[in-house]
């Protein structure tokens, strides 16, 4: 299991825990922890069988994940981060249609269908949602966005 050891909070410890849990069910796995400068080119080149990878969605749109992580790797942005090689022509067709669909209800239904197929096929194995804590005084309130970027307009001081 390839794992960065200086990219995510407790990344190497998470990988150690996964390797230990898999050993309990008979899945022999060797941990290969490395600095992110080595890790990312390694997995991007497909030189891995399983790896820990984090993902954030700055667009707040599921299409970003579908297009980048799930679509079959091809040219341009399509499947650019699909390092595991997941491929399903039906999911690809849905993603291509989602890209140009303007009807919100139809688009949402297609997103749900594509994500549902991917989940049933175990295209990825989600481990956890990393929350990066922010420290502040008790009287300071701010909404913690999924992309971990503070918006000053959302800060409230009581």
What do the PLM-derived regions correspond to, one by one?
Residues 10-15, 62-65, 139:
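Short, solvent-exposed loop/turn and secondary-structure capping segments
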Residues 42-46, 67-96, 100, 129-158:
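Short, solvent-exposed loop/beta-turn-alpha elements that line the ligand-binding surface or hinge
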Residues 19-27, 44-48, 71, 96-106, ...:
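Sec-exported extracytoplasmic/periplasmic mature domains
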Residues 10, 58, 83-87:
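A generic short alpha-helical patch detector that favors 3-5-residue windows
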Residues 1-57, 104, 131-132:
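Ligand/substrate-recognition segments at binding pockets and active sites
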Residues 10, 14, 118-126:
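Periplasmic-binding protein-like
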